[in-house]
Amino acid sequence: MANTSVRRRQLLSSVLLLQWLTTVLGVAWGPNPIDGSKHGQFPSLRRTEGVSQSGSGHKGSVYRIPLADMTFWSWMSYLKELPDIDESRNPILKRLLSGSFLRRDGSTTVNVRVPARELVRLLSLTPEQQREGVSAKVRLINLLDPKYSVYEPYLYREILPKRSPLLLPSLGEYRGAFLTYIFHPLSKGLVGDMLETGRSHPDVQVLAANMVAALKSLHNLGLLHRSIELNSFSVLPDGTVVLGGLDTAAPIGTETRLWVGFFGQETAPEIDRNFLADLALTQGRHTVKSDVYSLGVAFRNLVQLLGNGNIGPEDRGAVRQDHLELLDKLSQKMIEEEPGNRPTIEEIMKDPLFEGLNFEDIEEGKARPFRYKQNRL
């Protein structure tokens, strides 16, 4: 047993060393968009003034290199162009500089219930947003792998529309001393967590439709999510359910790295699941149908949570048994092992579960799946 453990540690060390050497060689030999001398296959990067895709209203940069063609130097250049934030002027953010709050992967999320005056000014928060608070999604700046630090800010500033009703909005993206930040409205909680506490009042039909419409809106932008689960969805202060966790998103039809590391049970069976594939963090088989599979697993978990009494007795009337049964049948179709046998998003929207719903209203963010106002978790 001890020898096996030692061999596995040696294998892990070897793989990580190989990844590090690959990164270093990429730095040494990769094209540098700043000087343009080695850019035969790519157009030059030129910063043009434009409104940021985030809600902060600050100026963003528009890159001509497609996301799938971004190189090490492209990400490094983009990291340098992120607007600065002075953590020392924000007491809660200042505590992050010690590094003790970061997880092992160099990330964390911090809730700022009472934003400091400097943060209010920086994010141009309205009085209502000040009262509701904000959250900060934080990542350590990794100079050996700048994409890790700046990938999600890039999506919000360059790809996602300024207003997308069913995607978690950004209030601004910044670079600090050694951390990058994305600020979001402070939500009431994550859908999975809210259901597990038994303090929620969900309309199952509307909630499931909202989740389908949110995924459709992401696919319409040409992006896969690749890591959907119940807690990928947040409930905003106004009751809207939005899709977040976009750091795992990638263009449809491309082979790109997925930075979340090991996969859970939500991953479609056609995705590589062997030990070395997980270590390499390289997944090349994600498709629209693999997102459908993950959403189907989320639906199955939703049925289990609500069907096992994880809601208060006063909520029982808000959860219709026939909707749970229809959702269970739909989830079984979505988690078929063969991708070709899974329904498309359009076919899912026509399922009997959603009979009588107006998906146009749902796609515009008018639905409120949780019927009663809840306190934050």
Curated annotation (Swiss-Prot):
Residues 1-26 form the signal peptide. Residues 39-58 are annotated as: Disordered. InterPro entries: Kinase-like_dom_sf, Prot_kinase_dom. Residues 48-354 form the Protein kinase domain. It comes from the Eukaryota. Disruption phenotype: In a mouse infection model, tachyzoite growth, conversion to bradyzoites and cyst formation are normal 4 weeks post-infection. However, cysts are smaller and their capacity to cause oral infection in a mouse host is reduced which is probably due to their increased susceptibility to the conditions in the host digestive system. One of its GO terms (cellular component) is cyst wall. It is found in: Secreted. One of its GO terms (molecular function) is ATP binding. Keywords: Secreted, Signal. Forms a complex composed of BPK1, MCP4, MAG1, GRA8 and GRA9. Interacts with MCP4. Interacts with MAG1. Interacts with GRA8. Interacts with GRA9. Required for the growth, maintenance, and/or stability, and thus infectivity, of bradyzoite cysts. The protein kinase domain is predicted to be catalytically inactive. Belongs to the protein kinase superfamily. STE Ser/Thr protein kinase family. WNG subfamily. This is Bradyzoite pseudokinase 1.
